[in-house]
């Protein structure tokens, strides 16, 4: 999305006065929309950290899980608007995590992006069994991922870094 009206910059313009009194801080907090809660389920620690940093830079609030059981616990405790789910995990599959969460009534208002280094037809077909989910093959470009997320959440302010 190239519209500047729906975006926020990562850094304030050089002319911005960063000093504010408590009244200004209260007013500015009221104007800032809540951050998009994102679950990142990825067993590769380096990729998970990169995704976490990118999502923070984009203005989202990511929570990372490296195992399916960690993700299930997080899904029970809090709501997410977006879940990026690796399919191949050491303790289960991303499909099983999502199916279990949906069976418990979790993830009802969550957009799901499955990703895997194995983009076989079987994997894509399995991902399509979850209504509204998207399959993204690894490796992927971060800018393409951001573009996809902007399409999923057109009204969310995002960072164009």
Predicted regions and their residues:
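Acidic catalytic/metal-coordinating carboxylates
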Residues: 67, 93-96
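Two-component/phosphorelay signaling modules centered on CheY-like receiver
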Residues: 45-63, 130-133
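Conserved acidic carboxylate
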Residues: 42
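Acidic, metal-coordinating helix/loop segments flanking the phosphotransfer/catalytic sites
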Residues: 64-82
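Short amphipathic alpha-helix used as the core "switch/output" element in two-component signaling
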Residues: 95-108
